[in-house]
């Protein structure tokens, strides 16, 4: 079936546009020009653009620059886009003009078409929907708004959920002692609660870092217009816009104290991405620890048993793999890679404008979404559900030669080292060898070498 087209005009001439498309000429030019990938701009970014258009229309109406009926129609159309009703009308590739002008015009055109249909007369993409704005302040603002909304409403709650799940598991395993490991080698004992507490602290610190990095993200570029001077925008626009946007999005924003900073650089986003990378590093460490602890079940550490979620091999029957920790490590790797892309893109601010904004938006929002989902998966399908293999823990503790460290203050380092070597070579319990090699009675040795007491620190007496 042959597709029908209509002719649209812009400042460069005529363009064939699909007859049923809500967008107009400039969006079609971008669709024709940019066929570099299968990635379109993230839905969260499109929603942020619509929030911006909605808040801008309200602001311009309040300032007396835009007729109330047109402003309301723009606001209604913007809300429909926010609600995801027209996702297919935003087809532009991520790899497009570096300012993101194509995506700004895509939003302007779709919203103008919808508003025109509501009113029965033409609403202009440029003169009405884009009033008092430039792509150069809209796109940086859309990055900031989409990131702030999704971090506050999605990622931070996910990190809190993971932290609480770790806390619950700490309580459940508070008295369970295991062999500690440094350099992947046997070390002094720790409790599961101590080990999980370290993980929880990583997650809590990551959440704090992300929260702190949100402060400059919430200081918006909107109002700087083309180069940061605010040309063609009412001097009151930025403050009222930020207030309106805060009410619409339920996230508190304010105007930047220096629009030149927000347009010419993406330093605040680079900083935020660095904090997302820190969270990814924490998840990578936790996931890999879980994989090691679950290794076996017979020829590995076998300290825990992760929930079996799916068959692990197409050739080896009965094999079950730690699929959730593995998936989380891949998420972490992707987020770390995204941070590198954002860092390079952040360097691309030439004079008054950064020109890698779309790829920054794509990678930043992907990182936020991936981390959100990974936190939930790790919490619900790994941390909350793993079981401890107490028999393996007790066997490893009994033969751990490093327990002799507790005897250092009593018999000296060299004597303790001899006992540790003999116990290891003979595969015997450190308690039995120490009883033979020292003049300490067994009751004293049992007290000194009690693994639970050794998790509490201090000096043996």
What do the predicted segments below correspond to?
Residues 1-461:
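Conserved, well-structured ligand/cofactor-binding cores
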